[in-house]
Amino acid sequence: MHIPTRSALRFSGVLLALAVVGCGGSSGTPTAPPVTDPNQIIALSATGMAAVQTVHFEAAVSGSVNIGALGSSGSALGLSGPLKLDSTTASGDFDIQKRAFHIAASMPVLLSLSADIIQVDGFQYTKISLVGTKYTKSSASTLPIASAAPNATLDLASTVTSLQSSLTASGAKATLVGHDQVDGRDAYHVTVSVPTDLINQEVGALGGAAASGVAIDSVTVDYWVYVDSLNPAKLELKANSATVGNLTVTLILTRYNQPVSIKAPADSEIEAGQ
């Protein structure tokens, strides 16, 4: 059975980049002055991307997808019709400077599917409940995160800059709704109208059978940005598609630049011969 782990990770990278475009990165400033212009919030956030070293995330997905839109991936699992994604979650930590991450995901409605993915020291370790109880080892995946070299370029920042230019050129509009609380902290609430043409372009860029012929009909994006640091706090994306289905994705980012420990699994937890 083939599970498109790398495609999912690439999509996660695009989603995170879109979130940063909409609501910013770390400014490295303990207390930022009040900002009322949503475009300025976006600009200030994007310029602080290089200061982000580590971050924790919690994600949740609800809604349903049409199995036919997944191409061979859905057929390989023996599924058909709509698949409800309620209670699907993912959480983890990124150590950007070390190109390391640890992600745990769960999809209870699909045979209690769970996955644990660790990338550290140039290798990726993947454990999927439907496949086995041990990790498989492979070369590290290519994600838009920086290397540990002192003079390395923050790849995610380049992705953000490119997406920001695309958003501006396509007529995306940001509106400051007000202030909310996220993780017990004040946060700016910004809505961004993202043209569906741009969303479909990014989906198509993922490649593969699952992306072929997929069209998003409407999308709403809400972002929250921590007032004190201009770090992205929360993303909520709602997408509707006649071909794919209806999805709501919520992403919460916390624990910026706090120490994280990401380690490879013990040899006894890795498939023999790898």
Stretch-by-stretch model annotation:
Residues I3, C23-Q274:
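Subset-of-secretome marker
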Residues M1-V21:
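Sec-dependent bacterial lipoprotein signal peptides
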